[in-house]
Amino acid sequence: MSALPTPAMIDAPRSSSETDGGPLTPEHQRALVEANQRGQKVMAAGKMAAFNGWTSGIFAALTLPFALFSLTALVVGAGLALVAWNEFRGRKLLLHFDRGGPRVLGWNQIGFMALLIGYGLWGIYAAFTGPNPYADQIKAMPELEQMLGPIDELHLLLAVAVYGCVIVFSMIFQGLNALYYFTRRKHLDAYLDQTPSWIVDLQKFSAGGGG
């Protein structure tokens, strides 16, 4: 008859970290934390690109229905759709830690700025060279011409103010966006130069850029 095992003969259960060292060593965990800190500004740029892409896409969708009646709306709507597509393309490159991502996003904002400036200039040109918006009323009631004269001038003034604001604000906002994207290149370079490749691959998937 065999003897019952004594407590000393029974080994205490070992934790998974003691048996296989765990999925990551302390050094690996430390490297991952440091990589997360280095990549924060790159990830923030990806979120900015997502916001810009969705915003441009929504405005494109709202503009394109008017393309049936206006060539200007067709050009602007198509331009906005292209900006949205390119913004998402640049975001994908950025989340794949492609060094060309910041450049694509920066130039996309410059293209967006050019589109808005062109739209503003065309609006001002059309206001000054197009037909009088009150011509039909004046033709039907000639006595209103004296009263509508100042209103016509106000129409031109409002056109300059509105389209001028479009031009100025696009230069400010799209210009700053472009500068922001271009300056992300140095942060991306620092991340890639100082981060082990296995962490880069891991963070591609965790950020939604893998696949």
Where are these regions (language model features)?
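Topology signature of small-to-medium multi-pass alpha-helical membrane proteins
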Residues: 2-211
